[in-house]
Amino acid sequence: MSIQVLSEKIRALNSDWPDRWVSLRDVFKSCHERLGIAVPFDQRTSRLLAGGLSVSNFVEHSCKNMARKNKEPGYHSRLHTAIVLESLTALLLEQRQIDKLNTQSLIREEILLLVAMAGHDAGHDGSRNSSICQLESRSFRLIRPLLEAAKCDERDIYAIKRIIWSTDPTLYEKLHNGARTTDFDLIKPSWQAVLCQEADILASAIPEFEKQLTLSLADERSKVYPISAEGLLSPGGRKYFLTHYAKFSSPAAR
């Protein structure tokens, strides 16, 4: 994967945030167009794409409302979601090259992943899970009506829920271990989850961005979890992240 190209995208997003910010909908649209998905090929895929545009628009405006009240999280913000979408796009493009696929082979699966990650932190208020998939479940509940309004296929809605739930960090190790028992295939739910997990934390594993992202997360947590925030900034905090969360199993990420 071209870390250089992805880094340029992340730098551009950082430079625009927040004063020259475009919108998450524009980032989502740019990502699916770079994947060559400008015109979907069937009704199911078209509806999925419409759902993704609606989800990204919803997250943009709900976060903007939070920002007006000075309540948008410092880390789990629109900027984070945009970086995740760019990271996922980079991984998908790299995987295409590895698999020698044309742009039409897995269009629905690729859009499915983009839609899931556009909404994976919907409604995030900077808190942490007190039970497994607590915040992830809330995010899905917020975006489900939008997917239903776009008449997305129930199979796709279920898959989006599954992917969003898989972004609970406590599930990373189990899901990566399970996926590694099979060959990579984007059609497989386990590998869909892994690729999205990788996109969620990829930027934090790039040395150029690790410090600022860690500071943003620590600042977000300091308001409610000061001890956790201190741990992130401690010498062992980075090591813990690399050991427990920075897992990269897909061919595209290795």
Predicted features along the sequence, with ranges:
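Short alpha-helical hairpin
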Residues: 37-67
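Histidine- and acidic-residue-rich, metal-dependent catalytic cores
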Residues: 81, 88, 136-178, 236-237, ...
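His-Asp-centered metal-binding catalytic motifs of divalent-metal-dependent phosphohydrolases/nucleases
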Residues: 84, 110-127, 139, 162-170
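Short helix-to-loop capping/linker segments positioned immediately adjacent to catalytic or ligand/cofactor-binding
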Residues: 101, 127-130, 147-154
